[in-house]
């Protein structure tokens, strides 16, 4: 059986491990920023300075990282084969 790809967990873990600062927008319009220290199925622990906030995921509207996050390499174009090995050296 193929391994399931969980985008949310990979995204949050990448932000946590690489210590990327994020802006978190809540559904009520409140905005906060900091570093993700931990997360589980229901919550995200955000740290800003010496303050920690435990935010419920259902209250989060958007998470914006301060730098680009690439979770998977972009698809590479297939190499063009202009010459076959037989054509070379003739």
Swiss-Prot record:
<dbReference type="GO" id="GO:0003723">
    <property type="term" value="F:RNA binding"/>
</dbReference>
<protein>
    <recommendedName>
        <fullName>RNA-binding protein Hfq</fullName>
    </recommendedName>
</protein>
<dbReference type="Pfam" id="PF17209">
    <property type="entry name" value="Hfq"/>
</dbReference>
<comment type="subunit">
    <text>Homohexamer.</text>
</comment>
<dbReference type="GO" id="GO:0043487">
    <property type="term" value="P:regulation of RNA stability"/>
</dbReference>
<keyword id="KW-0346">Stress response</keyword>
<feature type="domain" description="Sm">
    <location>
        <begin position="9"/>
        <end position="69"/>
    </location>
</feature>
<dbReference type="GO" id="GO:0045974">
    <property type="term" value="P:regulation of translation, ncRNA-mediated"/>
</dbReference>
<keyword id="KW-0694">RNA-binding</keyword>
<dbReference type="GO" id="GO:0005829">
    <property type="term" value="C:cytosol"/>
</dbReference>
<dbReference type="GO" id="GO:0006355">
    <property type="term" value="P:regulation of DNA-templated transcription"/>
</dbReference>
<dbReference type="InterPro" id="IPR005001">
    <property type="entry name" value="Hfq"/>
</dbReference>
<dbReference type="InterPro" id="IPR010920">
    <property type="entry name" value="LSM_dom_sf"/>
</dbReference>
<comment type="similarity">
    <text>Belongs to the Hfq family.</text>
</comment>
<comment type="function">
    <text>RNA chaperone that binds small regulatory RNA (sRNAs) and mRNAs to facilitate mRNA translational regulation in response to envelope stress, environmental stress and changes in metabolite concentrations. Also binds with high specificity to tRNAs.</text>
</comment>
<dbReference type="InterPro" id="IPR047575">
    <property type="entry name" value="Sm"/>
</dbReference>
């Amino acid at each position: 059986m193929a391994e399931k790809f969980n985008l949310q967990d990979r995204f949050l873990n990448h932000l946590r491990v690489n210590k990327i600062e994020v802006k978190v927008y809540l559904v009520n319009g409140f905005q906060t920023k900091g570093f993700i220290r931990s997360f589980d199925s229901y919550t995200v622990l955000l740290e800003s300075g010496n303050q920690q906030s435990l935010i419920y995921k259902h209250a989060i509207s958007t998470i914006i990282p301060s730098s680009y996050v690439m979770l998977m390499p972009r698809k590479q174009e297939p190499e063009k084969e202009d010459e076959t090995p037989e054509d070379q050296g003739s």
